[in-house]
Structures are given as C-alpha cells and as structure tokens.
Amino acid sequence: MNKKIDNKRVGFHSIESIIKNSPHKIKKLFIPQSRDDKRINNLIALAEKNGIKYQVSKKLKQEPEAEITNENNLSFQDLKIFLEEKNNKKLNILILDNIIDPRNLGACIRSAAVADVDALIINKHHCAPLNDVAHSVSSGGAEYVRIFFVSNLVNCIKYLKDLNISIFGLSEHSKTDYDQADFTENTAVIMGSEEDGIRKKTQESCDSMIRLS
C-alpha cells in the first residue's frame, strides 16, 4: 500500500520551517485562541511577513496547525535524476527500511537533517507513513532533506551500487564498529527498526554490515 504524505502540520518547529523554506505550501494557518505570548506572536509575524493569512481557532489548545498543499512523493525516477545531477559531488545517503513507528521515522528524518545527508530514501512498503506525527517529531527536518520513496529497495540498492556508492547496513550483531568503516567515498547507510533491524533481503544486498557501538 502506498504511504501518502499527510497534508497537515502540527507544532511550531514544523510550521516555522515550512514558512521559512516553502511558504507557498501553506494553504491555511490556524492559531490557538487560548495563546497570546511571544512565541505565537512571532509565528504570526513570520506568517504575515510571508503573506500567509491565519485564522484563530477555539478548538486548538496550545499548538498551531497548518494545512498544506498536496505533495507528490518523490519517486525512484526522481532519485535517478537527482543523483545524475550530483555526479561530481561526494554523496552521503540514508536509507530507511522497516521503520514502522511514525515517531521513529520523524526522529530519523531529524537526524538526517542535522547530519546534512544528501538524500533520504524510504522503503515505501515497509515504513511508517510520513504523517503529522512524523513531521512533528522531525522538528521541521523534512523541509531540509530530499526524501524519496521507492517500492523496490533491493533494485534501488543495486542501482546505487552501479553508481559506485558503498552500501552499509546497521546491525547490532555486526563485529565491525561504525568508526571502522570507510566513509571517504560515496556511501549509503541503511537503518532499520530498533526491534528487528533491517529486513533479510536488504541485509543480503549490503556491501557490509556495521554497528553503532
């Protein structure tokens, strides 16, 4: 089943990031009537500066909400075009496989944004939806990272290998520590769920397995 991107955003970090980076995405902004403080006033000022109209809502308690335009998921074909344009640049890619909790997905996106990865690839059929919960936990990170959804991760990994991108899978059972791996060339790191890790087929496609500690 295709995982759709939710068109609602909740929370200051997520909404502020959209206004700063892609204000055209916001269709409606809702402000909680119960708040009249510096943070909410700063958000209103930021919205007005970018020509975004807002509406005061009695239903909201503490956090603002925004309705954004429908987004089309970036696909494997989009990834190919993106990588072709980056052919002279050293690449650092994060791949998510088997992340089933939206909160964990959001945390991974936030980490990817902080680490300044070039692309985040998500296994579309084996991952949590990129909904408002994931966006909220990501603290706006989704606005800073190129996110691609692929339906066949094994084929995607094969394509990355053909581009001379080394594939490292994370596993607590590996005997090789993260700091022992060679990240001087183009690399992609695959991360799975805390409980089960990455799927067996995905592991078999990796060049090597490494552990974080």
What are these regions (language model features)?
Residues K53-S57, F148, I210:
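General small-molecule cofactor/ligand-binding pocket signal
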